[in-house]
Structures are given as C-alpha cells and as structure tokens.
C-alpha cells in the first residue's frame, strides 16, 4: 500500500525514478517544484539559508488578536501584504459572554485600520477561503494555523506561530535552511468508496512515528495524481500537516486549471512540474488502488488501521493501541457501535465529501437512537451549491444536521460527545480531550478519524462501524458551481486601503502583552513539569476549545496552561517567580555563580518530544507570561513549536538522554548570555536539589540563527523589534 525509500532518487521527465544519474544530486535538487518556488521567494541571495517573503497570509480568530497586538507593539502601520482574518473558530460566542464577538469586532476594526481582508463568522473556514480566493500556482502563503496547506493548488503554504506572521507584517523574512524534499509518488486509482481521508490516514500512519518527513517538503508526483479530482487532492493535502512535514506541493494539470477557472481566477493557474531531472532526498510510494477504508484510532491521526481490520479483531486491535476502555463499544455480535459522527472543517467539509455522503445516505435514515451525524460545509459557496442542487435536502432528510462553516468540532468548541462516547470524524485531529471533554471533571470521550464516506456508511448502518468500500453505491460525479455572492455581500476587502484614522475596537478581555525581561548573565530555572510521554501535543500544553475564548488576554489564558496534563503546573510556575528559593538552594547558587545576588529566576518544563499539533503560539507564550525561561527536550516535534519558544524568549534546550532531575529541582545555567552571544551550542548547567546538592548537566541548542539568538538575548520578539 505504502512504501518508504530512505535513500535519494532522481526523477526523469516526471515519469521514471532511478537511484543514479549523470547529473549530481546537488544540481538536480534544483529541478524540484519546491526548489523553484522557494528560491523565487528567497531574498537572502543564497539557496542554503533562505529568507522568505510570502505572497499572502491568513489567521483565524484564535490567533489574529495576539498577532496584531504584537505587531502594533513593534511599530505596525499597515499590512504590507494581503492578510486574511477569518472568524471560524470561536464563532458560536457561547463561552465568556461578549469576549468572542469582542474579538471579532477588533478584527474588523484592524482590517479597516491596517488594510486587511475580514471574513465574518459562518462564511468560511480559514483554509476553504484561502483555497477559493487566495491560492495560486507558484505562490507562497503563511498562516497562523498548522493546517495551512494549499499544495494541491500549486501553492506552497506553511503554518507557523503568530510571531512569524508578525515578522512578515513588519516586512521581515521567514528564515529557514533549504528543506529536504520528499517525493510522494502516487500510482494507481482509488477504489470505489475510498476518499481523501483514507489516503491521508494511511500516509500519516506510515511516516509519523519514524519522523520520516519531519520538517521536509512533500512533493506529490506520479501518474496517480491525474486520477484524483482536485478536491480529493485538497483533502489529502490538508492532512499532510499530521506527518510533521514543513509544507507540500503538487504537480498541476488540467484539473487544477479547471478549479481556478470555476473560481473566477484563471490567471492563478500555471503548469507546475519537476524539471527533466529532479532529485529528491527520499521517496514515499503510495499505491492508491490498494488503499482501503481507514480509521485513525484515538488519540492520534497516526494510529492507522483499516476499518475491516478493526472489525475483524476489535479487541485485539483496540488492545494494541491501549484502548481496552473501548471494549464496551463492541456489541454481542462483535460489531463496534459509535455514538456520533461529524463531517467538518477544512478536511471534511469539502463539497465532494458531502456529495458522496449524500449518495450513501439518500433515501435512508440514520435512526432515532444515540447515533447522530452533523455536517459542516466548509464555506457558504459550498453550502449554496449543496442547497441549489438538492444535496442539502437529501442530507437533512436522512437525519443529518447541517451546520454553517465552523471549525468547532476540530478543536473542541462544537459537537462535544457525551462522556465515554466514541465519535467518528472527518476532521483533522483526535488528540486527547481535543474534542472538548474535561478530564478534571472526570470526563472522557474518544474520537476516531474516518473519511466522510465511511462515516456516512456507518450512519446508514445505524451507528455500526462500516467501511464505505463494503457498499455498492453509484456515486454522483460532483459538478460544482462556485457562487461567491455570500462573500461579496459580507467579506470586507480592505487590502491597500489602510485608514489610520480608524480606532481599534477593544473589548474588556483584550489585553496587551506583559513586559518580558531580557536574558540575564545566568538563569536559574525551577522544574515545574516533567512529562515522559512519547509526544506532548500543543493541545496538552494549552487546551483548545472553550479555553481559546481567552486567547486575547495573555494572563487569563495562561491560567489554563498544561491544565489537562499537569494541573499543578500553573501554581508551581507562579510560585517560582513570586517566592525566593530556600537557603540551601540559594547558597549553592551563590557558590556556583560567585555572586551574592541570585540570577534571573524562571520556570522550565521537560518533555521528551513537545510541540506536535497546532501552530498556536499560546503553547509557548502561556509558559512565558508565567515566567517560563526554557524548555528541555530530547527533540522538538515540530519546527513551528521550537520557533514559538524562541520568539517568546525561551531557550529550546536539548538533552541527549532523559535528564536526572524532577519537579521541584532547580537548573542553573551558567554564562548563558555569553554563550548565546558567542554562538556556543553547548551550555554548562547544574541540577540543584532542595537540600543544596548539585550535579552537572549538559544542555545544547541546535541551528540557532543570528536573529534567533538576538531575540533570546532581548527576551522576546516584541523586545527585539522595540530595540
């Protein structure tokens, strides 16, 4: 089904792969589509260390307030590139009184003041709008959402934390080394009933755990590309984020051209293909004809098995993934019963998915028992077409509830299942508690990811888990007509029309960032959390869902940091900056520093591999406003989380082995300021126990740029620009 090839390969004329060729690998690397787009946007003058300027940017209502506030504090006067502000995450305004709609009105006032594009709530999810209106072949787009991926439309898109968008707003650059490029060689044609989520889940399952494509660009090539409709490609592409890759790009063809023509932007198309000789650092071959209906079991998109494998041995498969608590979902006939289905967001709410779901459900009923199914078309143009052609009526008639464009089910702000229930979703993630359950209140729920087709098949079977490939359905050939009249009525298009006389509209929850100190000569850090999970997600570092309503108030949001993973973290971090260490610790610190006064004191968390998941900067900024000085890790799950740490003034330390300290211990890093200035990557530190005992600890950092070092010295990105 999927084959990984670690060694590099040459692609000749877009058709033949070979291990060796007469052209050097270094020269042939320039033949990839990714290389051509990256170098076209590079301002550094060399192709090793890139300084990228993007064509457009996008943020949603969890992130844009913080980004604009940071940019304001750093001297923003107008948006220098098209910047789209969508309102698709906290659209329901159900938590915190007025605070969500206050943020939306702040966003509209900012779009008017600085010249932005404002998409009101319920009009579109962020990535649907960007696909429909802003993508273009050869473009690059930066978004403050990890699923910023438009590669199937010829657009290299990257999801990053807010500070990276701030840099673009201030006419600075996105600085990265030239990434490796992995060929995703698609062959064959999907069988009937297989959808984009099936392919995506299979791909994630094959590459995630090994980090095979981590921080690399996925370039989709091969004869199988032409066999996929454009929205099928979009559905695969948006999920590449879950592989931990940096970005993605696809060859373009007549189907890509037709997409742009349908959306009234024929000029956005151009043919993209590798040069006659292109070199890829590794390759993944996906035989589309062998992909089955898939399911990603809780609690990660990489927990991939076929639906029929799970059905054949439910207890064995569930036990393999540590999910024995789901044995209760197995009925007396050995079937797995689920309580909820959801088709939503940038991955699920695509037109083709909903048409296929309607084909399966047409004339059937989902029943009047526990099982419920909700569908969220990803944009008003999609909803408009579904209504015009009668597909919406078919879904409603089967018992499906049809909702507006909203990302809520993807991050815990809508369709939270009942306690102990299993939900199957065509959405992006299924991390622990991301669906909205509160473990502190003894709540738990489970989300498994499936394609819309198998979700509809399950719904048609009364909630009994069913693979769409087991059905004999005559699927409608989707015939989408794009009608953007809703956008023309409601979207504010202000790019190039900045009006400095407009006053920003602040609600009572919108607060400025607190002051953050510059780096001291030495730092003393108290260990406030020690996490030994294989991977720590950003949802665990700062929960999503209703917590996100407080996103515009840094101090209030910080109260929720690690609340579902380590509920005592916040109180420990606060105590660290408010209380002096005991005499034994102070004496040891003074002895090691040779000074009477204590160094700068902060907190630190250790996690083996933190930062998988969301691009939300709050995963780092919440630690910082509580006094966080650093993270210590064996490795960082994503480039974007490491960047968030640096941009908020926290050192991304690495340890070669699991460190021998525990919560309550102190870490003293001597000469840290001089080490950063001198570009040293190795830091001499000490673990100090409460009784004053000490032992040495070696910490490192890797590949910090000069700008990143200066940001650390200044204390955060805001200070860096102020100075």
Please report, for each region that a protein language model flagged, where it lies by residue.
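Fe-S-dependent hydro-lyases/dehydratases of central metabolism
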Residues: 1-723
């Amino acid at each position: 089904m999927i084959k990984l090839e670690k060694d590099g390969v040459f692609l000749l004329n877009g058709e033949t792969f070979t291990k060796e060729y007469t052209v050097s690998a270094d020269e042939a690397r320039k033949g990839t589509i990714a290389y051509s787009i990256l170098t076209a946007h590079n301002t550094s003058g060399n192709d090793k260390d890139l300084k990228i300027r993007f064509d457009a940017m996008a943020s949603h209502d969890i992130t844009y307030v913080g980004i604009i506030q940071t940019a304001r504090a750093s001297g923003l006067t107008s948006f220098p590139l098209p910047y789209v502000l969508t309102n698709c995450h906290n659209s329901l305004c159900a938590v915190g009184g007025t605070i969500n709609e206050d943020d939306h009105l702040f966003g509209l006032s900012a779009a008017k003041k600085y010249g932005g594009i404002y998409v009101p709530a319920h009009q579109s999810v962020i990535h649907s709008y960007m696909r429909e209106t802003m993508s273009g072949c050869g473009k690059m787009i930066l978004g403050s959402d990890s699923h910023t991926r438009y590669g199937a439309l010829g657009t290299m898109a990257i999801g990053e934390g807010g500070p990276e968008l701030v840099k673009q707003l201030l006419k600075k650059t996105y600085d990265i080394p030239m990434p490796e490029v992995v060929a995703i060689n698609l062959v064959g044609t999907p069988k009937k009933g297989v959808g984009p989520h099936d392919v995506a889940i299979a791909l994630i399952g094959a590459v995630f755990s090994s980090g095979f494509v981590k921080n690399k660009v996925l370039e989709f090539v091969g004869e199988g590309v032409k066999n996929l409709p454009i929205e099928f490609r979009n559905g695969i592409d948006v999920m590449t984020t879950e592989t931990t890759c940096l970005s993605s790009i696809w060859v373009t063809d007549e189907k890509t051209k037709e997409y742009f023509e349908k959306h009234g932007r024929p000029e956005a198309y151009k043919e993209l293909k590798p040069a006659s000789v292109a070199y890829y650092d590794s390759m993944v071959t996906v035989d589309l004809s062998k992909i089955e209906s898939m399911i990603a079991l809780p609690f990660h998109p990489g927990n991939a098995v076929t639906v029929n494998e799970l059905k054949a041995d439910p207890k064995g498969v569930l036990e393999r993934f540590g999910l024995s608590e789901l044995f209760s979902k197995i009925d007396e006939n050995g079937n797995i019963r689920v309580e909820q289905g959801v088709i939503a967001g940038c991955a699920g709410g695509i037109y083709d998915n909903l048409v296929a779901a309607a084909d399966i459900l047409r004339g059937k009923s989902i029943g009047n028992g526990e099982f419920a199914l909700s569908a969220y078309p990803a944009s008003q143009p999609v909803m408009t077409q579904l209504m015009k052609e009668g597909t919406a009526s078919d879904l409603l008639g089967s018992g499906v509830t049809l909702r507006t464009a909203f990302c809520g089910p993807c991050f815990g702000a809508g369709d939270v299942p009942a306690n102990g229930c299993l939900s199957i979703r065509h959405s992006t993630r299924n991390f622990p508690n991301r669906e909205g359950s509160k473990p502190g209140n003894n709540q738990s729920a489970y989300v498994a990811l499936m394609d819309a087709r198998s979700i509809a098949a399950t719904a048609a079977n009364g909630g009994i888990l069913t693979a769409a490939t087991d059905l004999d359905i005559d699927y409608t050939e989707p015939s989408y007509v794009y009608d953007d009249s809703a956008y023309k009525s409601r979207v504010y298009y202000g790019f190039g029309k900045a009006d400095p006389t407009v006053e920003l509209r602040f609600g009572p929850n919108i607060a400025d960032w607190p002051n953050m100190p510059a780096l001291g000569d030495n730092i003393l850090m108290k260990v406030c959390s020690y996490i030994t999970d294989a991977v720590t997600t950003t949802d665990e570092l700062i929960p999503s869902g209703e917590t996100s309503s407080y996103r515009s108030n840094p101090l209030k949001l910080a109260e929720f940091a690690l609340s579902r993973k380590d509920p005592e973290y916040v109180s420990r971090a606060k105590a660290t900056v408010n209380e002096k260490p005991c005499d034994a610790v102070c004496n040891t610190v003074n002895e090691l520093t040779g000074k009477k006064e204590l160094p700068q004191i902060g907190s630190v968390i250790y996690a083996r591999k933190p930062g998988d998941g969301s691009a939300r900067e709050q995963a780092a900024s919440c630690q910082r406003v509580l006094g966080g000085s650093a993270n210590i890790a064996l490795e960082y799950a994503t480039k974007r989380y490491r960047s968030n740490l640096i941009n908020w003034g926290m050192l991304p330390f690495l340890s070669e082995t699991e460190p021998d300290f525990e919560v309550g211990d102190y870490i003293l890093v001597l000469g840290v300021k001089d080490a950063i200035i001198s570009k040293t990557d190795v830091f001499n530190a000490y673990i100090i126990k409460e009784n004053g005992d000490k032992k040495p600890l070696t910490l490192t950092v890797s590949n910090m740029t000069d700008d990143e070092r200066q940001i650390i010295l200044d204390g955060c990105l805001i200070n860096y620009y102020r100075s």
